[in-house]
């Protein structure tokens, strides 16, 4: 079994590329990269389930535990609050301690938080259930800072160039998959207040499994040899130096601020969907269905778009088109969600909102790495996440603050005794912010693909497994001056011996953080 997992795949396959003439060993891939991807994906899915588990049944939770809706909303908001200060620490952990150590730490935090949330449901009297809910959610929020920054780094360190976007898509879309499960599972499980303990207990299961697999199955942060030329240099900058380079990179800052705002819009939409729709007369089950459609079509779109950009490398074009379509859909949702009886229209709009919006998330993470190379993937993806959470917290607070109580006839299905909220102004603001971020990104964002250019320039053999001629620098080089091609009479002089290959292997290992 171990021999199969450690088997190097043949260089003639599309999964390996490299030359014997480089100082570093020839790029190779390992089958056990899929195990790492499975663990990270399961952990991300479980963490998202825990984040959104209260939101689809917010009114029932508030009624059973004598909480206000503001308190229930804070169980989601705490993810935003803690991600801002601890997100930077998570970036340091990923780039300094290593991917394996960060994943194991995140798994244990996630599992501990899931258990702590269930304490108020024990058969003994708990004086302050909200304190346990908040403590458990806080631990899960700390785990999220480590989880969401991992996909880009995992893809870069373990996967070859033509699989990076797909690997990033799988691990990134595991998070909305968790949101989907929570949107469907929570309303299905909680028909009455007595069902809440069962719901909280079920959510412990995936967290426990992810913790077990992370502890037992992850052996190292990086493979023995890099899967691509760019992987060997991906963490060449120190943590503080990398952050400085990111802040000075205008294209990256623009991408981070605009897409961070998009993350905030989508996070607020997911957390508040049930409250928005119940005020217009829609049931919790229908709200869960809309949330499920939102995520299912998002995952489908991400799969198709990930495969497309893996082949074409059209990161910028795919991002801009996807965000434009997302903005138009957000306007439609703001208008239709305030009407009664529009179940088919709302279901279609939520499906399109997810299809266009969620699908660009893994593409943007790859684009962030491309425009910020050689800064570490943990820093480039993590900083976008931190900004997204900060903007998401501000947007969510602003949306809830702008709501007012309806005084006229009501079709509300919300279970609280107070008059339902009017979300009209809040939803128009949400659509306006989504459109603003999109316009700024479409008009002003442009960047070269630095990592692809570095890998193209570093190829020293015509047999390198290049995926597409459009991925190289547009500058044409005469055939006799192609970088890396050695005249036949000098080939033997420059071919490295075993010592030089061993030295290159050592240099790759020394640039990577140690396992913990």
UniProtKB/Swiss-Prot annotation:
GO terms for cellular component: membrane. The gene is Slc49a3. Residues 1-10, 504-516 have a biased composition (Basic and acidic residues). Residues 1-22, 453-516 are annotated as: Disordered. It comes from Mus musculus (Mouse). It is found in: Membrane. Pfam families: MFS_1. It is a multi-pass membrane protein. This is Solute carrier family 49 member A3. Gene3D superfamilies: MFS general substrate transporter like domains. GO terms for molecular function: transmembrane transporter activity. Keywords: Membrane, Transmembrane, Transmembrane helix, Transport. Its main location: membrane. The chain crosses the membrane at residues 34-54, 74-94, 104-124, 139-159, 170-190, 199-219, 253-273, 289-309, 321-341, 344-364, 382-402, 425-445. InterPro entries: FLVCR1-2_SLC49-like, MFS, MFS_dom, MFS_trans_sf. PANTHER family: MAJOR FACILITATOR SUPERFAMILY PROTEIN-RELATED, SOLUTE CARRIER FAMILY 49 MEMBER A3. Belongs to the major facilitator superfamily.
């Amino acid at each position: 079994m171990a021999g199969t997992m450690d088997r190097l795949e043949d260089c003639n396959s599309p999964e390996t590329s490299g030359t014997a003439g480089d100082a570093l060993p020839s790029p190779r891939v390992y089958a056990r990269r899929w195990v790492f991807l499975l663990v990270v994906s399961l952990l991300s899915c479980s963490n998202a389930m825990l984040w959104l588990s209260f939101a689809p049944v917010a009114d029932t939770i508030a009624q059973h535990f004598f909480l206000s809706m503001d308190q229930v909303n804070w169980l989601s908001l705490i993810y935003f609050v803690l991600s801002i200060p601890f997100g930077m620490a998570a970036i340091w952990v990923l780039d300094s301690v290593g991917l394996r150590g960060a994943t194991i730490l995140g798994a244990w935090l996630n599992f501990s938080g899931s258990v702590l949330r269930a304490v108020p449901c024990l058969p003994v009297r708990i004086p302050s259930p909200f304190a346990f809910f908040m403590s458990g959610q806080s631990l899960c929020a700390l785990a999220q800072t480590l989880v969401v920054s991992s996909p880009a780094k995992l893809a870069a360190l373990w996967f070859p160039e033509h699989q990076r976007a797909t690997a990033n898509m799988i691990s990134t879309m595991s998070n909305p998959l968790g949101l989907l499960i929570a949107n469907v599972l929570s309303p299905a499980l909680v028909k009455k207040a007595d069902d809440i303990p069962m719901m909280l207990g079920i959510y412990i299961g995936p967290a426990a499994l992810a913790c077990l697999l992370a502890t037992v199955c992850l052996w190292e942060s990086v493979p023995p040899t890099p899967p691509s030329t760019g992987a060997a240099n991906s963490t060449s900058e120190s943590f503080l130096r990398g952050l400085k380079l990111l802040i000075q990179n205008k294209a990256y800052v623009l991408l981070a601020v605009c897409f961070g705002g998009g993350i905030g819009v989508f996070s607020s939409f997911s957390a508040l969907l049930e409250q928005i729709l119940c005020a217009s007369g829609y049931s919790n089950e229908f709200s869960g269905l809309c949330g499920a459609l939102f995520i299912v079509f998002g995952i489908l779109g991400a799969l198709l778009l990930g495969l497309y950009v893996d082949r074409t490398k059209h990161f910028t074009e795919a991002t801009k088109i996807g965000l434009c379509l997302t903005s138009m859909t957000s306007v439609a949702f703001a208008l239709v969600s305030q009407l009664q009886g529009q179940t088919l229209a709302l279901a279609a709009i939520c499906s399109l909102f997810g299809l266009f919006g969620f699908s660009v998330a893994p593409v943007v993470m790859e684009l962030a790495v491309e425009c910020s190379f050689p800064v570490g993937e943990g820093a480039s993806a993590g900083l976008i996440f931190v900004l997204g959470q900060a903007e998401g917290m501000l947007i969510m607070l602003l949306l809830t603050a702008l709501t007012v109580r309806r005084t006229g006839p009501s079709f509300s299905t919300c279970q609280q005794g107070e008059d339902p909220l009017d979300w009209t102004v809040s939803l128009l603001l949400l659509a306006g912010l989504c459109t603003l971020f999109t316009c700024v990104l479409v008009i002003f964002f442009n960047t070269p693909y630095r990592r692809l250019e570095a890998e193209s320039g570093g190829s020293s053999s015509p047999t390198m497994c290049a995926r597409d001629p459009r991925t190289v620098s547009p500058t044409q080089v005469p055939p006799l001056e192609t970088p890396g091609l050695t005249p036949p009479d000098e080939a033997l002089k420059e071919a490295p011996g075993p010592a030089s290959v061993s030295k290159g292997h050592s240099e790759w290992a020394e640039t990577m953080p140690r396992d913990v």
